[in-house]
């Protein structure tokens, strides 16, 4: 009778499966990369632990006993499960060879995400990216709670326990109603915003805070328009309709200008702008993987957008 407390070893199960499939001890040993004596000892230990004969040995061939034939599918399933576990663990050890939960803010996603995903697909074909678009604060909370792996946001995040990895910087461009006299001008002083109705995004969008910071840093008290938008695309369409002006990042210019008739003006130096980069948990132990991820993103974005890569 088999002792139910007995726990077969993986070596014993592999030996049994190999012998059953090869029907030859020498061939089975070669398949496992062990000596024939090691194989025989592992199989003998399994049979002793089970108190069963699993194979009939002869000088030329190996035959399975009735018990061996009955237990073989279970042994094969156990070996396959361990191999699947090992493969999955190897994927977890390399976060860029599996699945990654990637957050991105709404004022970045529509303009760089297609380029980023194409670059990742080309350079990391085994990586599956799950994209979560949300406002900065909610992405940072998700990171700290472990429901996100990394996020592409405007820096600095200034969040305890998170590591920041800058990727690129870009200028802000002033979007104006069609036919505005400032359209196509360069060297526009930030102080000019004091004379223009400034459209802002809703609370929670980092671009709203950045626009207000631009005014504050320049000592300008902006005239805020009554209209607010939930997205940059809506803000630009409001500008297109003559409801005010707004700041848009350089990466958004080609997309937003193409679907509207807004005028564009460029600020005088030092040009206001923003820095975009990856953030992730400092405790993740994935610094090298995320450095590689950031490098691929930077290369992809730099090839398509008028931004300044941060080394």
Curated annotation (Swiss-Prot):
Cellular-component GO terms for this entry: protein-DNA complex
CDD domains (UniProt xref): PBP2_OxyR (cd08411)
Domain of life: Bacteria
Alphabetized PROSITE patterns for the sequence: HTH_LYSR (PS50931)
Organism from which the protein derives: Mycobacterium marinum
Keywords: Activator, DNA-binding, Transcription, Transcription regulation
Job of this protein: Required for the induction the katG gene for catalase. Involved in the response to hydrogen peroxide.
GO MF annotations in UniProt: DNA binding; DNA-binding transcription factor activity
UniProt-listed SUPFAM superfamilies: Periplasmic binding protein-like II, Winged helix' DNA-binding domain
Full protein name: Probable hydrogen peroxide-inducible genes activator
Keyword Transcription regulation belongs to the record: yes
Protein family according to the UniProt entry: Belongs to the LysR transcriptional regulatory family.
Gene3D superfamilies: Periplasmic binding protein-like II, Winged helix-like DNA-binding domain superfamily/Winged helix DNA-binding domain
């Amino acid at each position: 009778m088999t002792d139910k407390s007995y726990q077969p070893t993986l070596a014993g199960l592999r030996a049994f499966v190999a012998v059953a499939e090869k029907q030859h001890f020498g061939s089975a040993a070669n398949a496992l990369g062990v000596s024939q004596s090691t194989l025989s000892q592992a199989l003998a230990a399994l049979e002793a632990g089970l108190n069963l004969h699993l194979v009939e040995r002869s000088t030329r061939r190996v035959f399975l006993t009735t018990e061996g034939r009955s237990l073989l599918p279970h042994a094969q399933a156990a070996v396959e499960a361990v191999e699947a576990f090992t493969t999955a663990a190897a994927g977890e050890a390399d976060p860029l060879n599996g699945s990654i939960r990637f957050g991105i803010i709404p004022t970045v996603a529509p303009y760089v995400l297609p380029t980023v995903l194409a670059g990742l697909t080309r350079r990391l074909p085994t990586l599956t990216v799950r994209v979560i678009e949300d406002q900065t604060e909610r992405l940072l909370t998700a990171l700290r709670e472990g429901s996100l792996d990394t996020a592409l946001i405007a820096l600095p995040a200034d969040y305890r326990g998170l590591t920041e990895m800058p990727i690129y910087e870009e200028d802000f461009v002033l979007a104006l109603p069609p036919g505005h006299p400032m359209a196509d001008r360069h060297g526009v002083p930030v102080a000019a915003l004091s004379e223009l109705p400034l459209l802002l995004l809703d609370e929670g969008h980092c671009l709203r805070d950045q626009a207000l910071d631009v005014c504050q840093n320049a000592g300008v008290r902006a005239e805020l328009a009554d209209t607010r938008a939930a997205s940059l695309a809506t803000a630009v369409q409001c500008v297109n309709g003559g409801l005010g002006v707004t700041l848009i990042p350089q990466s958004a210019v080609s997309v937003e200008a193409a679907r509207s008739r807004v005028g564009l003006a460029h600020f005088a130096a030092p040009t206001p702008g923003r820095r975009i980069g990856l953030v992730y948990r400092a405790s993740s132990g994935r610094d090298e993987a995320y450095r590689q991820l950031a490098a691929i993103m930077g290369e992809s974005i730099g090839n398509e957008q008028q931004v300044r890569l941060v080394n």
